[in-house]
Amino acid sequence: MGMSKAVPALPVRHIETAIAVYTRSFGFTAQYSDPTFAKLTRDDVEIHLWAADDDSWNSRPDTAPWPVCSGAETFLAGTASCRITVDEIAELYDELSRAGVLHPADAGHPVATDWGTTEFATVDGDGNLITFSTSTVRTQSPVVDGDGNAVTTS
């Protein structure tokens, strides 16, 4: 038995508003939607959106045993993230830059990482983080100590 793929499910406040952002800004196509759920695709990528639209937590007594009761509380919207692997990172970066969805701390270009990717981050209309990456060919893996600091090797 093997696993074949993972599908991120991101919490959003309003399904229809989020569908508009994902189709207009990210280039996804809505395959299915109802008031509480949507399935979107672009190329081989599938994303699910679920409605975090329960604001009853605002009127719950302070004695509630935990803040999440229904699992769809509005404060959950925008708290998720996912990573999507792409082939042409520069082209997608330019497209999403024009769409205005790059993360506020964007470096102005895709960034090469120490873990062998080149990537950039975006945020959807609710604040969910979507990072796009591509594998980077490395000639040598970095050596790090237990704190994650680069170690010089000879």
Where are these regions (language model features)?
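Short beta->alpha transition motifs characteristic of CBS
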Residues: 52-53, 113-114, 121, 131-139
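Residue-level recognition of short loop/turn positions
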Residues: 43, 124-126, 147
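Vicinal oxygen chelate
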Residues: 13-16, 70-71, 75-126
